[in-house]
Amino acid sequence: MRNTGAGPSPSVSRPPPSAAPLSGAALAAPGDAPSALYAPSALVLTVGKGVSATTAAPERAVTLTCAPGPSGTHPAAGSACADLAAVGGDLNALTRGEDVMCPMVYDPVLLTVDGVWQGKRVSYERVFSNECEMNAHGSSVFAF
């Protein structure tokens, strides 16, 4: 019999939703759960010429993930994560290296950092007088 939409359709017996087979995560055994949960730490760092995020086009961008372990496109993810952990994720606490000499040339670069550090949102923007000054601050975090 074909259902044309006119009149009652033939009754079809279906199992109740609770009797449906389990799949995916529902099949996972309790022992398969992660041993410990962690707060995410994942950042996107960009750098571009200029003094304002509205006018400076990003020239380079990297990703930096520090939890559960260092990864991302940052060239020194391990040391950058260690440097951030040492200051509790406070980007303002990253200090300038004393042994770095930079030229006194004004060619401003804008650094932005957005993402999450240990579960808390991060939005950081800073203008450096030139790229050497940016690299001198923040040790390996800003060196990309």
Swiss-Prot record:
Annotated Gene Ontology cellular component terms: extracellular region
Main localization, broad class: secreted
Matching Pfam families: SSI
Compartment(s): Secreted
Bridged cysteine pairs (disulfide): C66-C81, C102-C132
Residues carrying the site annotation Reactive bond for subtilisin: M104, V105
Sequence segments annotated as region (Disordered): 1-25
Keywords, comma-separated and alphabetical: Disulfide bond, Protease inhibitor, Repeat, Secreted, Serine protease inhibitor, Signal
Ranges of the Sequence repeats in the UniProt entry: 33-37, 39-43
Ranges of Low complexity composition bias in the record: 1-12
Signal peptide: 1-31
One function term, GO molecular function aspect: serine-type endopeptidase inhibitor activity
Family: Belongs to the protease inhibitor I16 (SSI) family.
Subunit structure: Homodimer.
Physiological role: Strong inhibitor of bacterial serine proteases such as subtilisin.
Name of the protein described by the UniProt record: Subtilisin inhibitor
Organism annotation: Streptomyces albogriseolus
Gene name for this UniProt entry: ssi
